[in-house]
């Protein structure tokens, strides 16, 4: 993971990992050496990278897979219950607080405010956190918002130029030591071995995402330019893109759609960024004309359509409903090939949430043949 997606990106990272693992397995087998290797990868890579998936399958007998899971409600409630009833939060809010990073930011804010922070999305939480810290810089340290913003942006720009999450304190402008100390005091920055970093990586991601958002409002071309070349499209950019798209959707749906289209249809954009775009689409509830037009274009593209169906539509009643209303599902069901199977899988994925969709689409196939009856039964 680190070899492949950090600023020190290596195109042959998987080859290096395969060679390392092979050598370790040989040591275990012939030298009886009790040595193990831990390899971290993200779910989307394990699912979408065919070569990685096949390699893991080949050495499956020597692999123990461990999934890093989210907090359970019983682990979260003792913290949140100090400020509000966790069970009364929306599903989206509860899911955000299951992630340790966001629960930590929530608690920091709640303790400072003396009450539960108002939020709907991660974007709300991190923006509130930064605003709260800037207020503390003014109230407790006498530092103006303008000076805080200038220093904050200086740190962000230095990190961005170096493609790193930290910056040497020797690179900071002369006379900034007091602001630096104040930002460490209020919990915006940390310093170790003269290296400055943000207390939460989400602060850095939000700041870069905001810049990407500004470029997206300007034009899709500026948006792509800010994402950078393939070498620069690290996993860090994934989080920046997530924030930028959330802000674009709130501000201007047409600009949001134009930027999504630019990312999906550009050959020089890495798939892990396109994968994020597909995941973003599944969380949109209301489709206006620009987004409907874009969805139709994606479905008509033979390369993008399978990923859209799997990553955006599967399990998403809103999108499956759209496919039904626009005759895509009925057309696919009338085909006798892979698309029919995909249509049935989509209907099955929303059978609990939208049973009427299954009735509308499958009623005409009841008793058409024993095979069709079995397919319908499987969907249910």
What are these language model-derived features?
Residues 15-20, 71, 147, 236:
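Soluble or luminal CAZymes and related metallo-dependent hydrolases
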Residues 32, 90, 168, 269-270, ...:
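Generic structural signal for alpha-helix starts
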């Amino acid at each position: 993971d680190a070899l492949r997606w950090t600023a020190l990106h290596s195109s042959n990272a998987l080859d290096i990992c395969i060679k390392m693992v092979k050598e370790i397995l040989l040591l275990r087998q012939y030298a009886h050496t009790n040595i193990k290797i831990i390899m971290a990868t993200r779910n989307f890579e394990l699912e979408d990278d065919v070569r990685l998936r096949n390699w893991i399958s080949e050495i499956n007998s020597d692999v123990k897979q461990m999934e890093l899971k989210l907090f359970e409600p019983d682990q979260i409630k003792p913290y949140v219950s100090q400020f509000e009833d966790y069970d009364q939060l929306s599903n989206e809010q509860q899911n955000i607080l299951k992630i340790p990073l966001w629960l930590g930011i929530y608690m920091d804010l709640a303790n400072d405010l003396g009450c539960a922070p108002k939020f709907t999305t991660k974007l709300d939480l991190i923006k509130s956190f930064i605003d709260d810290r800037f207020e503390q810089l003014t109230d407790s340290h006498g530092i103006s918002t303008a000076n805080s913003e200038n220093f904050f942006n200086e740190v962000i720009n230095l990190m961005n130029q170096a493609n790193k999450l930290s910056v040497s304190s020797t690179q900071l402008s002369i006379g900034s030591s007091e602001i630096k100390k104040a930002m460490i005091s209020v919990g915006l920055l940390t310093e170790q071995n003269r290296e400055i970093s943000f207390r939460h990586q989400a602060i850095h991601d939000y700041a870069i995402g905001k810049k990407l958002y500004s470029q997206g409002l300007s034009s899709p071309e500026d948006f792509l330019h800010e994402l950078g070349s393939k070498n620069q499209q690290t996993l860090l950019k994934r989080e920046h893109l997530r924030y930028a798209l959330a802000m674009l959707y709130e501000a201007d749906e047409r600009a949001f759609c134009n930027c999504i289209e630019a990312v999906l249809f550009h050959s020089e954009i890495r798939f892990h960024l396109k994968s994020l775009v597909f995941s973003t689409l599944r969380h949109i509830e209301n489709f206006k004309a620009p987004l409907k037009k874009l969805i139709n274009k994606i479905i008509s593209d033979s390369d993008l359509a399978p990923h859209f169906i799997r990553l955006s539509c599967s399990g998403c009643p809103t999108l499956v409903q759209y496919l039904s209303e626009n005759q895509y599902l009925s057309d696919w069901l009338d085909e006798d090939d892979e698309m029919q199977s995909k249509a049935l899988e989509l209907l099955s994925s929303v059978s609990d949430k939208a049973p009427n969709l299954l009735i509308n689409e499958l009623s005409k196939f009841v008793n058409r043949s024993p095979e069709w009856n079995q397919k319908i039964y499987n969907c249910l």
